[in-house]
């Protein structure tokens, strides 16, 4: 009788280790990060984004494979032309209001308004656009490398005629 209980305990411990092991290993090489708002370092958004936005990398490296967390700060009147990304992204509005539309043309009338606290999950390769009427800050969680492919290549700020 005791042998049966001992075997069940051992099997239970093995099952727990199998479930917990990958989760523990996943973050084992990552140091914990604590960042307060005043400590965030904002820089100009990459050249693939329209000028005027600021970005802060909170975790990971958007230019490399793997998870990352960034914040994007946009001025009033900021617009990102229709585009798509290779990876899924989760977006949370921290302040202001972000307008998102799912189409190949920017149409302010059909955009969804997401105010502070609002959340949007966007599967990879979905065509969309975004704009803000007031200064807005969003947090984006995704996997790198981050890319932005404009539906109309002429909308790509990197290819804009100077």
Protein language model regions, located:
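Conserved short histidine dyad/triad with adjacent acidic residue
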Residues: 68-85, 114, 124
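Short acidic-glycine-tyrosine-enriched beta hairpin
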Residues: 63, 104-125
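Bacterial N-terminal signal peptides that target proteins for export
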Residues: 2-12
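A short, N-terminal "cap"/entry segment at the start of jelly-roll beta-barrel domains
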Residues: 24-68, 153-162
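Double-stranded beta-helix
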Residues: 33-35, 109-112, 131-162
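Glycine- and acidic-residue-biased ligand/ion/polar-headgroup-sensing regions
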Residues: 75-78, 84-105
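Bacterial N-terminal signal peptides
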Residues: 11-21
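Short beta-strand His + acidic residue motifs that chelate non-heme Fe in jelly-roll/DSBH
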Residues: 80-82, 100-101, 122, 127-133
């Amino acid at each position: 009788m005791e042998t049966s209980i001992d075997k069940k305990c051992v099997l239970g411990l093995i099952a727990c280790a199998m479930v917990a092991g990958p989760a523990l290993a996943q973050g084992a090489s990552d140091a914990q990060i604590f960042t307060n708002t005043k400590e965030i370092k904002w820089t100009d958004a990459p050249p693939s984004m329209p000028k005027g936005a600021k970005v802060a990398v909170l975790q990971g490296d958007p230019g490399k494979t793997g998870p990352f967390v960034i914040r994007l700060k946009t001025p009033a009147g900021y617009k990102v032309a229709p585009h798509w990304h290779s990876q899924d992204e989760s977006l949370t509005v921290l302040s202001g209001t972000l307008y998102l539309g799912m189409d190949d043309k920017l149409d302010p009338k059909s955009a969804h308004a997401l105010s502070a606290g609002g959340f949007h999950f966007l599967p990879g390769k979905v065509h969309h656009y975004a704009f803000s009427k007031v200064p807005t800050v969003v947090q984006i969680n995704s996997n790198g490398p981050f890319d932005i492919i404009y539906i109309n290549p002429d909308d790509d700020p990197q290819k804009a005629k100077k």
